[in-house]
Amino acid sequence: MKPEQFVHALKEKGINLSEKQTEQFYIYFQELVEWNQKVNLTAITDQEEVYVKHFYDCVTAAFYHDFNQEISICDIGAGAGFPSIPLKIVFPQLKITIVDSLKKRITFLNHLATKLELSNVAFYHDRAENFGKNKTFRESFDIVTARAVARMSVLSELCLPLVKKNGVFIAMKGAQAKEELEVGKPAIELLGGEVEEIHTFSLPIEESERSIILISKKRQTPKKYPRKAGLPNKEPIE
């Protein structure tokens, strides 16, 4: 997907990018490729692939949920900033918090935010399990997102504790989403969530399957969750 195809594909979905936003995506691509030589950020560095598999893929969340308002988003394990930085470029009024366990990635994100002239972005070098226990952040976000970080049973324990009541957890997954969801349902319910919608679609041009799962936060998460770092992955709630 060439940059101009990216702009056109979003336009078809009712998202019109300004020249500044188009330029921000191009700078993002350049910085990603340059920094990737010294920090492991992505296996995808070809321009056309970055535009479809990273940029377009991230913005698909906005096809199924309204981001056109002043809302706070926490992105767990964002790595190189996916999905929250592409969403922030498209919807500048969003308040973004990114949590990642690798310091080098946080350094990249701070640099990127400066280059892209982004405001209302905060980056935390922390484990999601510890961050979710922090009273300042626990149950404080309108939306929590994660993109292909872990399977649903694990992801729910990392993300749902951070979602405020009546907020939304948006999980961005690949082709295996429905199977993962079946296994993950006990965890979702235990942690106060309820599956609202699942959307499955193919990316344009290269046609790999994607799923977006919307989970609403109906009840407070029990205090014992998330458990200590490493345990959700080692002993998932299933």
Swiss-Prot record:
GO terms for cellular component: cytosol. It is an enzyme of class 2 (transferase). Gene3D superfamilies: Vaccinia Virus protein VP39. Its EC number is 2.1.1.-. Residues 219-238 are annotated as: Disordered. It is found in: Cytoplasm. Keywords: Cytoplasm, Methyltransferase, rRNA processing, S-adenosyl-L-methionine, Transferase. It holds the Pfam family GidB. InterPro entries: rRNA_ssu_MeTfrase_G, SAM-dependent_MTases_sf. S-adenosyl-L-methionine binds at residues 77, 82, 128-129, 147. Its main location: cytoplasm. GO terms for molecular function: rRNA (guanine-N7-)-methyltransferase activity. Belongs to the methyltransferase superfamily. RNA methyltransferase RsmG family. Specifically methylates the N7 position of guanine in position 535 of 16S rRNA. This is Ribosomal RNA small subunit methyltransferase G. It comes from Oceanobacillus iheyensis (strain DSM 14371 / CIP 107618 / JCM 11309 / KCTC 3954 / HTE831). The gene is rsmG.
